[in-house]
Structure formats: structure tokens, C-alpha cells
A protein has these predicted regions:
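Nucleotide donor/acceptor-binding cores
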Residues: 1, 69, 142
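NAD(P)+-binding Rossmann beta1-loop-alpha1 motif at the extreme N-terminus of oxidoreductases
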Residues: 1-51
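Hydrophobic anchor at the start of a short beta-strand
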Residues: 3, 24-26, 116-119, 170
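Short, well-ordered alpha-helices that flank and scaffold nucleotide-derived cofactor binding pockets
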Residues: 17-21, 85-89, 112, 272, ...
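Short alpha-helical
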Residues: 32-33, 78-79, 104-105, 154, ...
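Rossmann-like NAD(P)(H) cofactor-binding subdomain of soluble oxidoreductases
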Residues: 50-135
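Internal alpha-helical scaffold of NAD(P)-dependent oxidoreductase catalytic cores
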Residues: 89-90, 113-118, 133-183, 188-189, ...
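NAD(P)-dependent Rossmann-like dehydrogenase/reductase catalytic/cofactor-binding core
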Residues: 164, 215-302
Length: 302
């Protein structure tokens, strides 16, 4: 299969490198420095005591105009429209898009470029750390869950086979929107709070005052999810967040790293979308609105 990885950060490089063992993979990025480094040095993946190197043919966004079978989207979800518009040459009527991005409403954006039945959404427990351009260390392994945006299970199974063949533990969900909601509870709490308090993930549970904020945001988000047709048990949601803090809490969230490095975050696709849904259902979401405004305020100070 011919695959284009759009966005060559840690996750794009990791997934692309693994898939390149059995597929033809090209890498697309918006930064010339990244493109030059990948072409010259390839990709290095570190997993435990094992280090592997991969060739990485890379192109500047908009410069690769051959259609592909699959686009793997690893830019920030707030950059989807710009990235895909720049790279429209990748698409034909059969091209599949896989997005493992955080946030809501991604399928609506992708459907501007491919048919909804060609869109696979998902979530992954895999977490990688970028040590340098094209040098990636696996921090946490885990399951990747895929699902069709329009209940095209055959397509989701195709994605599962593709990833499984390259060593990814992959499952298919019949209700990917519920999976996205489950992932959202973690992202709308731990991401902004670690960024605001400049702390590791584990501190969100260890510090009782931050944990009180986690509970407030999570409970409010559960109420919005119910209005959207999805019911969740608050105790189970908080247990999920607590377990992540305890078991995977030594690292830093993506939003913390974005703020630290003065990059724009995905806050509008996370808490911002919760606020939008609340507005849609004529409900207030003051906790989500507070962290949305707080992170946006920090971004304006860069």
C-alpha cells in the first residue's frame, strides 16, 4: 500500500517507520528543516534497549502531488484544513484517511477532501517522545482503536489488518464516537491542567486542589456527553483519569509541551468543542470555558 504520513512529529515518524516495513511510505511536513533532516538521516526509533533506523523519503507540504492509497494524519487537529488543502494532490476517489487525533468534529473536516465512507477515526494508547528531528523514543505502548465515521466496518477492518501487519495491537470499535468521548475525558482535564500548572501528569492526582479541578471539569463534560446521547458513569471516568495519573504520570502531556515551547495548542478542539456543544444544547460549561480561556490567554502572551 502507498501511504503518505502528513505531519512528521514523534507519532507520525513512529507509525510511518513501522508501516514502512511492509508498505511504501512517504513523509509530508510543513517545515523544510524537518524534510531535509528526514531525507538525510532517516528515522531512528528507540524501543527499550532496541534501536532501529529507517529510510524516510520526505517532501515539503504541497510538493508531493501523486495520489496515495492511505493518508495518515498526524498534524494537530487545529491544522487539518490547512494541511489537507496544501496536500490535495494526495487524494483520489479511493484514498483512505486515518486520523488518530484528539478532538471532536474531525470527520466533518476530513469529508471536505474524501468521501465519509473513506474516513477512519481512532484513538491510540501509544505515546512517543521526540528526542530530535526523526529520532523518536517509545514512551508507552498500547492498543490502537479504529472505527468508521459512517459505520463502514469493512473499511475499519482494513485499517486493523494494515496496522496489525506492522506490529500494532489494533481493535475495531462499532461505536467510535463513544471511544472519542472516553478519550476526551482525559484530554479535557489532564492536558489543560498540566499546561496551566506546569506539572507532570501524576501531579494532577497527587495535588488535591488540582484533582478537585479534574473532578469539576470531568463531571461537567459527562453532563454535556449525556446531552449528546452518550451516558458515562462519573466514578468510572474518574477512575480512568486517576489510573493514567498513577500508571503513566511521569511524563508530560502534549499541551504542557506545547505551552512550554510556545506553540499553539489543541484547546479549541478539546475544551472549546465541549463549550460549543454546551451552547448547542443551551447548557453552561463554566469549567471548560475557564480552561479554554486560560490556555488561549497564555497563547496570546507568546
Amino acid at each position: 500500500m502507498k501511504i503518505a504520513v502528513v505531519g512528521c512529529g514523534s507519532m507520525g515518524c513512529y507509525f510511518g517507520a513501522k508501516l514502512s516495513k511492509k508498505n511504501e511510505v512517504v513523509y509530508i511536513d510543513a517545515f523544510q528543516k524537518t524534510v531535509d533532516s528526514l531525507n538525510q538521516n532517516g528515522i531512528t526509533i528507540k524501543e527499550g534497549d532496541k534501536t532501529e533506523s529507517y529510510l524516510a523519503p520526505a517532501f515539503l507540504a504541497g510538493k508531493y502531488n501523486s495520489s496515495v492509497d492511505l493518508v495518515l494524519l498526524f498534524v494537530k487537529s487545529t491544522q487539518n484544513i490547512a494541511a489537507l488543502t496544501q496536500n490535495e494532490g494526495l487524494f483520489n476517489e479511493h484514498t483512505i484517511v486515518i486520523s488518530l487525533q484528539n478532538g471532536f468534529g474531525i470527520e466533518r473536516e476530513l469529508s471536505r477532501f474524501v468521501a465519509p465512507e473513506n474516513i477512519i477515526l481512532g484513538n491510540t494508547a501509544i505515546n512517543c517522545v521526540k528526542e530530535d528531528i526523526g529520532v523518536v523514543k517509545l514512551a508507552n505502548g498500547g492498543v490502537t482503536i479504529l472505527g468508521s465515521a459512517v459505520d463502514n466496518k469493512k473499511l475499519a477492518l482494513t485499517g486493523k489488518v494494515l496496522l496489525n501487519q506492522s506490529g500494532f495491537e489494533t481493535e475495531v470499535s462499532d461505536d467510535i464516537k463513544r471511544v472519542i468521548w472516553e478519550n476526551a475525558f482525559v484530554n479535557v482535564t489532564l492536558n489543560p491542567l498540566t499546561a496551566l500548572f506546569k506539572c507532570k501528569t501524576k501531579v494532577c492526582y497527587e495535588n488535591k486542589n488540582i484533582w478537585a479541578l479534574v473532578e469539576s471539569i470531568a463531571n461537567e463534560t459527562i453532563e454535556i456527553a449525556k446531552l449528546d446521547g452518550y451516558s458515562f458513569d462519573a466514578e468510572k471516568v474518574l477512575d480512568q483519569i486517576r489510573n493514567i495519573c498513577i500508571n503513566f504520570g511521569k511524563g508530560y502531556t502534549p499541551m504542557y509541551q506545547d505551552v512550554k515551547n510556545k506553540r499553539f495548542t489543541e484547546i479549541e478542539k478539546l475544551n472549546g468543542q465541549i463549550v460549543n456543544l454546551a451552547y448547542k444544547y443551551k447548557k453552561d460549561a463554566p469549567n471548560n470555558e475557564f480552561v479554554l480561556n486560560a490556555i488561549k490567554a497564555i497563547e496570546r502572551l507568546y
